[in-house]
Design a protein with these regions (language model features):
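Walker A/P-loop
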Residues: 169-189
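SF2 helicase/translocase NTPase motor core
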Residues: 100-114, 119-124, 136-151, 156, ...
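A short beta-strand element within the Helicase C-terminal
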Residues: 320-323, 583-595, 620-623
Length: 982
């Protein structure tokens, strides 16, 4: 390794795409290199730096930073820096200091290796060419980033992921109902943004109980390696910022929100995307905001992208929902009163969309649409739709375009995506089983006194230190709180008849029993869950793991795993309210609500633990209550007032806000309760009608546009069934030294051989490897099988090593053919386009590295169009390395001339390649920019920063494409030989 000096030019051996680097600084141990073309700075160990000093010799062509070219005659060195002397393209003698070399210059490593006799195996060359071909094809594919994850192809999830991941620094609220896959949507968005280089780092904040679930999901479904950060790990890094130790950081909200110092460190780290799960817990009001909200607000002001996840966006009321929208776009959502006014107009838009179906021929429908359509393009479409003389195809086209325009230009649908079960469809039936039990004397004694004595409630609240109405609807908690009462000598679970009922059902193998099924039990309080489990153990000998917020993450995961185990696992899992939030228990169909929560959204979250995408059975909801108790009255309000157990309706927050206080006062009075139930039912029906006509209707229509979703799915299926993938993987595994064994049923086992190249994901020498399949359905049915795709880490690693390294960039082979005399030479040169640009531009979607193949015979005749790559490769034979070196040495000058001529031949193709890339870019981005600008005139949810970013991106892409150059990627020398082997 040469000595380093500031100003010298070096190139990375393993990352040639970085362009020409400049030494910024160095000392005895390290050197810092700036790669200006790709906006990257790297620091290397001086003793092991994978760098090559750039030194040109006589005859080499160089490019200056000012754009003029020169052929080098000689070079001079002074104080470690080189100055080149030669003639420019006009014949003028000029000097060029190395500091003035163009940052975008490329270096023909293949040329240097070939002329020095370094040749690789012929099958390596073949694999390299095929890798470049497939990489070029896949990088431009519309399903890139969505086809690899281990997921079912569910339309609404894929539509949202595709729509959001196309945006610059997306900031959205993912608000699908419980069980519709918000975590998968967020994972898809994250995966795609990482894969296409739009983002490099992400911070994921989730409730403590969900950290391991997120960790496992991101690894198992998306092959994303995430660092779980906690206080212990943070302290292990000493004074260093722990948030800068990984690309993807997962942290507990409980930990971060309670630690101001760690919050400052997170804010100081340069993340590109922030994901916040269970965002309804971010407390805010017009008077004050909670610590959790303030933390996320500060982080989101520094991090460009933001995904907020919540199944209950309005659980804390409309103001709290507005606050979350304010996090997404503070400029757009700054006035709560104005926001409420906008909400009033969504019904008109939804009505106009429905009216489209009644045209032509309905004058009232025309008026309804006219009221909300005011731009010239939409009016022209409306005229076509209303014209009875237009044909059916014209009507349908105009109707579809108008529907898209109305959805785009109105409402919060651009920043909030909310799908409902009603809109998605295909969910199992919910069955409510009401169980009436006799109230235990200890509970009845308190309830009867409350019914007789109004003042006793105040005494009870003081004595028990409980809130109202908790003291009424959770009798076991009240019993525990009154433990000083001499009558309360037995444990509550010993006198509570719900325990006896549970034990009977758990041992009953009849139709009404649970003996052959898994049962999830949810209670509101942690102490209730703990006592319930103890009662099952002592009274029935049943071991039931408990899942509550007081457990450590490991203890919680252990309890969930014990319940999920089909063979040796527990039949029952007991959960507290908070402890079970966000968990997925869809393998279970029986849910016992030991008590009921106060808020309808919490009730829906309970049911959502089982009622999820993938649930194959009807959901059996068992609610034991005591006759004449406040709990029974609460059940009636839920069931009779709002059909809360039959399906999610999305209006529970409104109903609770309207009747919550009155309901609490009516839990001891049937007459008052009956009035509240009737009023609730009336408002419930009205709210459902408003939903169908207003904002929720718009959100549902906008959250999944079927035609676009189907197009995404078809693109994914195209890659799923790509016949080239298995062939490519088979060749690559063989060359990288991975043994593959067919196990049957479309499954193979991959195992490292002793000769395997190190560092392949999931494969370590001496270990067993893993089983894999190309079939999506088979991979989903078996957790122990990985799914191989073009996006699998193993595939990407092998392709990356080939394209970024020297593997297969030179080769020499023999061609024996009766029609060709022996001793002749051909050179097969493969050039590829190269354009140093920031990864965040995602240039590859328009102009990926593109192969230009040139085949020349020894006279310089271009045979590219006459002899295909495949046809030639099938007729070649290998040559041992010593003979190959001798042949190259003997034809050295001839090869140099062919390399020069081949470059000229390839350069003729470059303008058309750049033009095609520019055209693809303009077709997509010009249309998208025009669409956003048109939307901004009607929909304030379109951010100015988004339009500006897209405009700058378009210009940056155009500038980058203009700097595209060709470089020699690989070369194969072909020598003809006697077909008879003489």
């Amino acid at each position: 390794m040469s000595d380093f000096s500031p100003g010298q030019r070096w190139i990375s051996d393993g990352e040639a795409e970085l362009g020409l680097g400049t030494v910024l600084s160095n000392d005895f141990r390290s050197v810092t290199i700036l790669f200006s073309a790709s906006q990257e700075t790297r620091t290397y160990n001086t003793r092991q730096a994978p760098l090559t000093r750039v030194m040109f010799g006589s005859g080499d062509r160089v490019l200056s930073a000012d754009g003029w070219k020169m052929i080098v005659d000689e070079s001079r060195e002074s104080r470690g820096l080189i100055t080149y002397v030669g003639e420019d393209e006009h014949g003028n003698l000029r000097e060029l200091p190395e500091a003035k070399l163009a940052d975008t210059m490329q270096f023909d490593q293949a040329r240097d290796r070939l002329l020095t006799g370094q040749v690789d195996r012929n099958d390596w060359f073949d694999l390299r060419f095929r890798t470049l071909h497939h990489f070029q094809r896949i990088e431009r594919h519309p399903a890139l980033g969505l086809s690899g994850p281990r997921i079912d192809l569910i339309p609404h999830q894929l539509y949202i992921a595709d729509e959001v991941s196309r945006r610059h620094a997306p900031r959205v609220l993912l608000a699908d109902e419980v069980g519709l896959g918000k975590t998968i949507e967020a994972g898809l968005i994250l995966h795609r943004l990482l894969l296409n280089g739009r983002i490099e780092r992400a911070l994921i904040l989730v409730p403590d109980s969900l950290t391991h679930q997120w960790l496992v999901e991101l690894l198992r479904r998306f092959s994303l390696d995430v660092r779980l950060l906690n206080e212990t790990q943070s302290q292990a890094h000493g004074l260093a910022n722990p948030f800068e130790t990984a690309q993807l950081v997962l942290a507990s909200q409980n930990w971060l929100f309670a630690n101001p110092h760690r919050q400052e460190q997170a804010e100081a780290s340069q993340f590109d995307l922030l994901i916040v799960d269970e965002a309804h817990h971010l407390a805010w009001s017009e008077e004050e905001s909670g610590a959790s909200y303030q933390c996320v607000e500060r982080l989101s002001s520094k991090i460009p992208g933001l995904l907020l996840l919540t199944a209950t966006p309005e659980q804390m009321g409309l103001a709290s929902h507005f606050a979350r929208l304010r996090l997404l776009d503070p400029e757009r959502y700054h006035d709560f009163e104005r926001f409420k006014e906008e909400e009033q107009h969504y019904g008109e838009v939804a009505g106009a969309i429905d009216a489209l179906e009644r045209l032509p021929g309905d004058a009232e429908a025309r008026e309804a649409i006219d009221a909300v359509v005011d731009d010239r393009d939409s009016q022209a479409l409306l005229a076509t739709l209303a014209n009875p003389e237009a044909d059916a195809a014209q009507h349908e086209s105009a109707r579809g375009q108008l529907r898209e325009a109305l959805l785009d230009r109105h409402g919060t649908g651009r920043v909030m995506f909310r799908n409902s079960r009603r809109h998605v469809g295909g969910f199992p039936e919910r069955r409510l089983h009401r169980v009436s039990l006799e109230m235990p004397p200890a509970y009845r004694r308190v309830v009867r006194r409350l019914e007789r004595d109004e003042d006793y409630l105040d005494e009870l609240l003081i004595e028990s230190e409980m809130d109202h109405p908790d003291v009424l609807i959770y009798p076991d908690a009240m019993y525990r709180a009154l433990s000083n009462d001499p009558l309360n000598v037995e444990p509550w679970w010993h006198i509570d008849r719900r325990i006896n009922w549970l034990l009977e059902r758990l041992s009953d193998d009849g139709e009404e029993g649970f003996a052959n099924d898994k049962v999830l039990i949810i209670a509101h309080h942690r102490d209730t869950a703990l006592g319930l489990a103890e009662g099952l153990r002592v009274l029935g000998g049943i071991h039931a793991p408990v899942f509550h917020e007081g457990l450590s993450l490991i203890e919680r995961d252990r309890a969930a795993a014990a319940f999920a185990d089909e063979e040796d696992g527990s039949q029952v899992l007991v959960c507290s309210e908070i402890g079970s939030e966000g968990r997925n228990f869809q393998f279970c169909r029986h849910l016992v609500m030991f008590d009921l929560p106060q808020h309808p959204d919490q009730l829906e979250q309970r049911i959502g633990r089982l009622d999820r995408i993938g649930q194959k059975h009807a959901i059996e909801l068992h609610v034991p209550t005591f006759v004449g108790s406040p709990g029974e009255r609460l059940l009636r309000w839920y069931h009779e007032g709002m059909d809360a157990f039959s399906a999610p309706h999305g209006v529970g927050s409104d109903l609770f806000e309207a009747f919550g206080d009155a309901l609490a006062d009516a839990l001891l009075d049937d007459d008052s309760l009956n009035e509240i139930i009737a009023e609730t039912r009336t408002l419930f029906s009205a709210r459902l009608a408003e939903q169908d006509a207003g904002r929720n209707r718009l959100l549902e229509l906008n959250a999944c546009r079927p035609a676009k979703a189907e197009a995404v799915i078809e693109a994914i299926r195209e890659l799923d069934h790509d016949p080239a993938l298995p062939r490519y993987i088979e060749r690559a595994l063989d060359i990288f030294g991975v043994d593959s064994q067919e196990l049957g049923a479309g499954i193979m086992h991959l195992q490292p051989s002793p000769q395997m190249l190190d560092g392949l994901p999931g494969l370590v020498k001496g270990e067993e490897g893993f089983s894999a399949t190309f079939d999506r359905a088979r991979a989903l049915s078996r957790d122990d099988i990985q799914r191989l795709s073009w996006e699998h880490p193993l595939t990407r690693e092998m392709m990356g090593r080939i394209l970024d390294g020297t593997m297969g960039n030179t080769a020499l082979a023999l061609l024996r053919h009766p029609a060709i005399s022996s001793g002749r030479l051909m050179a097969e040169l493969v050039f590829r386009t190269h354009c140093p640009a920031p990864r965040s531009l995602h240039l590859n979607r328009f102009l990926p590295p593109t192969a230009v193949r040139v085949l020349l015979d020894e006279s310089g005749a271009n045979l590219t169009g006459k002899i295909s790559f495949t046809g030639l490769s099938q007729n070649l034979q290998k040559v041992n390395k010593s003979m190959a070196r001798d042949l190259i040495k003997s034809r050295h000058d001839q090869l140099r001339e062919l390399l020069t001529q081949g470059e000229s031949e390839a350069e003729r193709e470059l303008p058309s390649i750049i033009e095609a890339g520019e055209k693809r870019m303009r077709e997509q981005l010009d249309g998208e920019l025009a669409r956003l600008q048109a939307l901004a005139e009607h929909n304030p949810a379109v951010r100015d920063v988004e339009i500006d970013a897209l405009s700058r991106e378009r210009q940056a892409l155009s500038d980058a494409m203009e700097s595209t150059r060709l470089r020699l990627d690989s070369v194969r020398v072909i020598i003809t030989a006697d077909p008879k082997g003489r």
